[in-house]
Curated annotation (Swiss-Prot):
Component of the 30S ribosomal translation pre-initiation complex which assembles on the 30S ribosome in the order IF-2 and IF-3, IF-1 and N-formylmethionyl-tRNA(fMet); mRNA recruitment can occur at any time during PIC assembly. GO terms for cellular component: cytosol. PANTHER family: TRANSLATION INITIATION FACTOR IF-1, CHLOROPLASTIC. InterPro entries: NA-bd_OB-fold, RNA-binding_domain_S1_IF1, TIF_IF1. Pfam families: eIF-1a. Gene3D superfamilies: Nucleic acid-binding proteins (2.40.50.140). This is Translation initiation factor IF-1. Belongs to the IF-1 family.
């Protein structure tokens, strides 16, 4: 019987967390977010936020996870 391989979960340390303000709501639940550092990022809503119907509006403060591979895109993981 072959050995079962353990599934590797994405390590949260791979992504960078940042905070910013939603500037604009774009189609397909995409948002333009201005980070506290001044950079603009395109961000989408995480799956848990979609499931729980958490609404995001322009002006909301949000926490993002940004991939180190593409720093111009991110995922919104929390609304403050």
């Amino acid at each position: 019987m072959p050995e079962q391989r353990e599934k590797k979960k994405k390590d949260e340390s791979d992504s960078v967390r940042a905070e910013g303000v939603v500037e604009e709501a774009l189609p397909n639940t995409t948002f333009r977010v201005k980070l506290d550092t001044g950079h603009d990022i395109l961000a989408y809503i995480s799956g848990k936020m979609r499931i729980h119907y958490i609404r995001i509006l322009p002006g909301d403060r949000v926490v993002l996870e940004i991939s180190p591979y593409d720093t111009s895109r991110g995922r919104i993981v929390y609304r403050r």
